[in-house]
Swiss-Prot record:
Membrane topology: Multi-pass membrane protein
Record's protein name: Adenosine receptor A2a
Biased composition annotated in UniProt, kind: Polar residues: 401-410
GO biological process: one example: regulation of DNA-templated transcription
Region feature Interaction with GAS2L2, mapped onto this chain: 322-410
Segments crossing the lipid bilayer: 5-29, 40-63, 75-97, 118-140, 169-193, 230-253, 262-285
Comment block on domains: The cytoplasmic C-terminal domain is necessary for targeting the non-ubiquitinated form of this protein to the cell surface.
Taxonomy of the source species: Eukaryota, Metazoa, Chordata, Craniata, Vertebrata
GO MF annotation list: alpha-actinin binding; calmodulin binding; enzyme binding; G protein-coupled adenosine receptor activity; identical protein binding; lipid binding; protein-containing complex binding; type 5 metabotropic glutamate receptor binding
Keywords (A to Z) from UniProt: Cell membrane, Disulfide bond, G-protein coupled receptor, Glycoprotein, Membrane, Receptor, Transducer, Transmembrane, Transmembrane helix, Ubl conjugation
Amino acid sequence: MGSSVYIMVELAIAVLAILGNVLVCWAVWINSNLQNVTNFFVVSLAAADIAVGVLAIPFAITISTGFCAACHGCLFFACFVLVLTQSSIFSLLAIAIDRYIAIRIPLRYNGLVTGMRAKGIIAICWVLSFAIGLTPMLGWNNCSQKDENSTKTCGEGRVTCLFEDVVPMNYMVYYNFFAFVLLPLLLMLAIYLRIFLAARRQLKQMESQPLPGERTRSTLQKEVHAAKSLAIIVGLFALCWLPLHIINCFTFFCSTCQHAPPWLMYLAIILSHSNSVVNPFIYAYRIREFRQTFRKIIRTHVLRRQEPFRAGGSSAWALAAHSTEGEQVSLRLNGHPLGVWANGSAPHSGRRPNGYTLGPGGGGSTQGSPGDVELLTQEHQEGQEHPGLGDHLAQGRVGTASWSSEFAPS
């Protein structure tokens, strides 16, 4: 694989990584059903993948040219991708722990896992990622080693900017790989095994002796489907990143072995960066709520198609209604709860002059036109304030489904 082919493939990966993960963040932003603690970590993971496309891949392309630079400037370019890798690892680990709590102790989940705690954990994960990834900047590097070839080529105080020339391999193998990649991956493997074993045990218990107050079988199956989807993401992360780390281990432990050829290194680097592209496809394939929201975004904002109002659906573009009593009607517009009032008014028990009124009765309209009807955003309330989704539907309202309902099998 030549350097020009490598650069073209890397640029294609960068574009796909940016577009796909922006779509993930956009979906969570506009769809209140996706705004939950687990998806906070998903957004953090998507942010790291966006940064791979925007920064890490251009840095990797620049380093591949072997340009002359100050050693610490080159070192920053080389280490930045390690920061993003570490952030992805921590986000995946946080998601695994979140799903473990949801399945093992579901009754305590809402008390233990809150939005504020999740945001705090995400902030800590990013701080740790920068500390771990930029450790070579603090002195664990090859900048102090004199390289006569670099001095002749680039001049005094400058080096040929190549990854292995500035980042020591003992840091990459012992510190980066063994401590902060392999160990978290093994921990995630153990967590997901515990999740599936616990779910299997609970399903068998439900079949033999169902207990009052337990979750229904369908709810638990949705949780298991969610865990499988996220376990696939962890598996793909390992599949994409382990080849590059294995090559580093051979380079470090077998000094007499022939160095990996350039085409193999290019292939391993491309595979590692391609991990930033795959996650949105997994969400779209495995998670119904993400898939529907992706379609809605593409149709509405890319293809510029307006979706007509569908009863029971999650989209509405127009509403014509008239009655004699003022009453709120709740709808959802592109995933957002909405209140519909005549003339932009608050609820009113009496007949409205110069416009329509909405209510349970079937009366006619007074003066005015359908243009007087407008949609006002209504504050979304958490599930604790509502008695249940069935009650909402019975009252003509739309509630927020549980997180696991996003992962209902297609």
